[in-house]
């Protein structure tokens, strides 16, 4: 959203769906930072759940802005990153925030790291890797690292979005 509010990218519907699926009351907080949003999270009791609005509505998020991260940190006592797929991004909510809170890897992150270690450490041979994704540029370093370790390397990279069926 390039730092601008976009109703189609709002997390409000996610909060509503999460509440319905979990049978929990989910407090949706429409503004991620500021005194009012922090006051709401500070009033929470054990077992209550809140969801902040999409952080990418703030340019500071993707800029890994320390002041923004410090404002986000005001909501919490610890930071747990359980999103292995986003761990490579240096954003305020995934990187800079760890300067202001004790930071831990969550159970899914730990499992992913253990699997990666097993695959790259001393795996049973032959070894094949399947690497996919939309951004070729973000895969170059990974591919260069994997090539000497693999007998087979398959790369599925989405190059473009066709506007009409290809036949």
Give residue spans per PLM region.
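Active-site loop-to-helix "anion-binding N-cap" substructures in soluble metabolic enzymes
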Residues: 1-160, 164
